[in-house]
Amino acid sequence: MVTHSKFPAAGMSRPLDTSLRLKTFSSKSEYQLVVNAVRKLQESGFYWSTVTGGEANLLLSAEPAGTFLIRDSSDQRHFFTLSVKTQSGTKNLRIQCEGGSFSLQSDPRSTQPVPRFDCVLKLVHHYMPAAGAPSFSQPPAEPSSSPSSEVPEQPPAQPLSGNPPRRAYYIYSGGEKIPLVLSRPLSSNVATLQHLCRKTVNGHLDSYEKVTQLPGPIREFLDQYDAPL
């Protein structure tokens, strides 16, 4: 197997710290999965690439709870980390890449299934409140029955009238049980008007059939970034 370095985000002038950002790909398909993930993350506007956990803590320190960003993991076993501001400060959740999908890091003691996705953006979208996170226009990946993570699923809360039930997720850290809330990404750059329009369109395409009715060039443009966030 070949060890590949991480991918620096566009516009990042700081050199890559190869002592911390190397990981072995298990297969060509995993390599392609990560390459596609990096491409979409770079377009998302909230991928902070090589910032460290300490730097992420500083970036999020003045932000309200629920603000989050994606960065490269300092753990050589993982590619990405989700850093989120919680009621108890900034928490860092590793994103696992296994079996052709991404998930939050597993807790071996849990028996709950872990939501798994073929895209990091879909993973993030899954943990965002339904009211503030429009649906993806593409069919979701099949979930896996793997053990749950540091953010285990809980029984669904009683839904409000007209709203579907939604599971609650928690972070277990230092003996604390902290609600996981992803409400707003922390932007690393100014988005182009073209990208903002694409996100808006994605958020209003609530069915795959609507996508297939669009002209080919527009479908291709939307496919390059199929997230509403």
Swiss-Prot record:
Start-end of Low complexity biased regions: 133-152
Region (Extended SH2 subdomain (ESS)): 34-45
GO function term, MF aspect, one: cytokine receptor binding
Keyword vocabulary terms for this entry: Growth regulation, Phosphoprotein, SH2 domain, Signal transduction inhibitor, Ubl conjugation pathway
Stretches for region Disordered: 132-168
Pathway noted in the entry: Protein modification; protein ubiquitination
InterPro entries (UniProt xref): SH2 (IPR000980), SH2_dom_sf (IPR036860), SOCS3_SH2 (IPR035863), SOCS3_SOCS_box (IPR028414), SOCS_box (IPR001496), SOCS_box-like_dom_sf (IPR036036)
Annotated spans, Kinase inhibitory region (KIR): 22-33
Annotated ranges, domain SH2: 46-142
SMART domains on file: SH2 (SM00252), SOCS (SM00253), SOCS_box (SM00969)
Domain SOCS box: 181-228
GO BP field: cytokine-mediated signaling pathway; intracellular signal transduction; negative regulation of receptor signaling pathway via JAK-STAT; protein ubiquitination
Highest taxon listed in the record's lineage: Eukaryota
Post-translational modification remark: Phosphorylated on tyrosine residues after stimulation by the cytokines, IL-2, EPO or IGF1.
Gene3D superfamilies: SH2 domain, SOCS box
Domain notes: The ESS and SH2 domains are required for JAK phosphotyrosine binding. Further interaction with the KIR domain is necessary for signal and kinase inhibition.
Role this protein plays: SOCS family proteins form part of a classical negative feedback system that regulates cytokine signal transduction. SOCS3 is involved in negative regulation of cytokines that signal through the JAK/STAT pathway. Inhibits cytokine signal transduction by binding to tyrosine kinase receptors including IL6ST/gp130, LIF, erythropoietin, insulin, IL12, GCSF and leptin receptors. Binding to JAK2 inhibits its kinase activity and regulates IL6 signaling. Suppresses fetal liver erythropoiesis. Regulates onset and maintenance of allergic responses mediated by T-helper type 2 cells.
PANTHER family listed in its UniProt record: PHOSPHATIDYLINOSITOL 3-KINASE REGULATORY SUBUNIT, SUPPRESSOR OF CYTOKINE SIGNALING 3
Known partners and oligomeric status: Interacts with multiple activated proteins of the tyrosine kinase signaling pathway including IGF1 receptor, insulin receptor and JAK2. Binding to JAK2 is mediated through the KIR and SH2 domains to a phosphorylated tyrosine residue within the JAK2 JH1 domain. Binds specific activated tyrosine residues of the leptin, EPO, IL12, GSCF and gp130 receptors. Interaction with CSNK1E stabilizes SOCS3 protein. Component of the probable ECS(SOSC3) E3 ubiquitin-protein ligase complex which contains CUL5, RNF7/RBX2, Elongin BC complex and SOCS3. Interacts with CUL5, RNF7, ELOB and ELOC.
Protein name according to UniProt: Suppressor of cytokine signaling 3
Protein's organism: Bos taurus (Bovine)
